[in-house]
Design a protein with these regions (language model features):
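Carbohydrate-binding/catalytic loop surfaces
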Residues: 164-167, 256-264
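Short, Lys/Arg-enriched N-terminal segments with co-localized hydrophobic residues
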Residues: 25-49
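Surface-exposed helix-capping loop/turn segments at secondary-structure junctions
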Residues: 129, 187-200, 222, 245-252
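GST-like domain detector, emphasizing the conserved glutathione-binding G-site
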Residues: 46-172, 176-182, 191-193, 197, ...
Length: 264
C-alpha cells in the first residue's frame, strides 16, 4: 500500500508528479513503459517490509542498553528478550543460539549478529545514525571501542572472586581509568565544537558513550548531570544535550522492566 505522502515523495523523485498549492495533489502522467521503471524501483523501496529484530541479553543495562536506546531513537520496534543468566550458563550458551557463546545477540530476520559494538555499527547505518564517510565512521568505531574497554575493565574487576583483588580492581577503575577516559572524551568534544562527538548531529558514537556514562554514574536514571562529570565542562554540556533528546529522555523514563542491579 502506498499512502499519500509516499506518492508525493515518488513524484518528486521521478519528476513525474504535479503539486498544486493549498491542496496537494499528485498525479503520475501516462508514460511509455520504459520510463516508469524508476518508479517501480521506488515503489519497491517504499513498500519493503521492515526487518524483524530480536535482541537477546541478560536482564541488565550492560552491553545491550546502547542498542535499546538506538532502537528508541530510530523509533523502530524490536523484541527485547531478557535471558535468565542461570538458564544461559547451564543450557543456552552451548545450544548454538549465539555463534560466539556470548550475549548480546541481535537476530535480523533470523540472521544472528554478535558483539555489541558491531551490532551498534550495523544499526547506525540502517537508521541514519552513522557519521558521514569512512573516516568519521572510523572515529565513531574508535569511541565505541574505548567504551568497550571501559565495560571490560569494570566487568573483570566486579567479577573478581578474590575480595582484595576485587576491591583493588574496582578502585583502579573508578578512581583512575574512568576519570582518565572522561578527560579523553572532554578533549574530543572541546575540539569538535559542534555539540556532538562527530559532525553536527547525534550519531551512534554519542549514544554509546552517553549510555555507558548514564548507566555507570546514574544507574540508567533520567535525572541531571552526574557529579563525576561536572569537572569536565564540555562533557557535562554534551551529556545534558544528549540526555534531553526527546526519544532518549523518554526511554530513560521508561526503562525495560525486570532489570537487576549492576555496575553499569
Amino acid at each position: 500500500h502506498i499512502n499519500h505522502a509516499n506518492w508525493l515523495c515518488l513524484s518528486l523523485l521521478t519528476r513525474e508528479g504535479h503539486i498544486t498549492s493549498h491542496h496537494i495533489s499528485v498525479s503520475i502522467e501516462s508514460k511509455p513503459r520504459h520510463t516508469l521503471r524508476p518508479l517501480a524501483v521506488f515503489v519497491r523501496i517504499f513498500t519493503r517490509a521492515m526487518p524483524k529484530y530480536k535482541l537477546s541479553y541478560f536482564p541488565l543495562r550492560g552491553r545491550a542498553e546502547a542498542i535499546r536506546i538506538t532502537f528508541a531513537v530510530a523509533g523502530v520496534e524490536f523484541d527485547d528478550i531478557l535471558v535468565n543468566p542461570e538458564e544461559w550458563f547451564t543450557k543456552l550458551k552451548h545450544s548454538g543460539l549465539s555463534p560466539s557463546g556470548q550475549l548480546p545477540i541481535l537476530e535480523v530476520d533470523g540472521t544472528v549478529l554478535t558483539q555489541s559494538k558491531a551490532i551498534l555499527s550495523y544499526l547506525a547505518k540502517e537508521f541514519n545514525l552513522a557519521p558521514k564517510g569512512n573516516l568519521q565512521q572510523a572515529q565513531a568505531d574508535s569511541l565505541a571501542h574505548v567504551v568497550n574497554e571501559l565495560e571490560t575493565t569494570l566487568t573483570e574487576a566486579y567479577g573478581e572472586k578474590d575480595p582484595e583483588r576485587k576491591e583493588k580492581g574496582m578502585k583502579t577503575a573508578t578512581e583512575e581509568v574512568i576519570p582518565d577516559k572522561c578527560g579523553y572524551f572532554e578533549k574530543i568534544l572541546s575540539a569538535n565544537k559542534n555539540g556532538f562527538f562527530i559532525g553536527e548531529k547525534l550519531t551512534y558514537a554519542d549514544i554509546v558513550v552517553f549510555t555507558f556514562l548514564n548507566s555507570y554514574f546514574m544507574k540508567g536514571k533520567a535525572e541531571g548531570i552526574p557529579e563525576g562529570l561536572k569537572k569536565f565542562p564540555s562533557l557535562s554540556a554534551w551529556y545534558e544535550r544528549v540526555r534531553t533528546q526527546p526519544k532518549i529522555l523518554e526511554k530513560l523514563k521508561n526503562p525495560t522492566d525486570g532489570f537487576v542491579d549492576y555496575i553499569y
